Design a protein with these regions (language model features):
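Noncatalytic scaffold domains of N-terminal-nucleophile
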Residues: 1-139, 143-187
Length: 189
């Protein structure tokens, strides 16, 4: 989700690119969804949303915009106490997935504060998206994503990815102590 305000025109806009529910998922989350995390996977909108924002407001090339994220994934970042806490919280889950273990665990154990985490597969995916736009994610990788999610019990399909579109909405507005407040019409972080 993104709220944008143009000081020159005084106009505000809101772009919704939250995840959506897969078309084949007919029930809401229930007690079984806690056991099957893949059931909770929605249609991701981040890539399409950022691209739409870039098309409308961007001032650098798409490739330049993604370079810092590519560099961070490739060169890595240090484990902070808060990141370590998050990893320890889902350690059992991570340990059961070799792809996650290889990136986030050290010899099968949580990393230490100060260790560097590198994610070369993410760097390569971001490079592909930087070169080919969001279609690299929503079309080219769609079958691979579908197979991965469905093999784990989720509902996400390649067709869900292909159909995903961010959409514009009116932002929430109000006044507080003489200041105009412009925000998302939904709760979010």
């Amino acid at each position: 989700m993104a709220t944008y305000y143009c000081a020159e025109t005084g106009q505000a806009s809101f772009l919704n690119f939250r995840e959506t529910t897969p078309a084949e998922q007919t029930s809401l989350l229930d007690e079984h969804s806690q056991e099957n995390k893949a059931f909770q996977i929605g249609v991701p909108g981040q890539t399409a949303g950022i691209y739409a924002l870039w098309e409308q407001y961007g001032s650098m090339s798409w490739d330049q915009l993604l370079q810092p994220a590519i560099q961070l994934a490739r060169q890595g970042y240090q484990v902070t106490p808060s990141l370590l806490g998050a990893i320890e919280l889902i350690y059992g889950e991570m340990a059961s997935h070799p792809e996650l273990s290889e990136i986030y665990l050290r010899d099968g154990l949580p990393p230490r504060v100060g260790d560097v985490i590198q994610n070369e597969p993410l760097a390569q995916t971001l490079e592909t998206i930087a070169q080919n736009g969001p279609s690299a994610f929503y079309q080219n990788l769609a079958q691979e994503i579908e197979m991965s999610v469905q093999s784990a019990g989720g509902y996400l399909t390649a067709d869900d990815l292909l159909r995903y579109q961010p959409f514009a909405e009116h932002p929430a507005t109000g006044t507080y102590r003489g200041y105009q407040i412009i925000s998302s019409p939904y709760g979010g972080s």
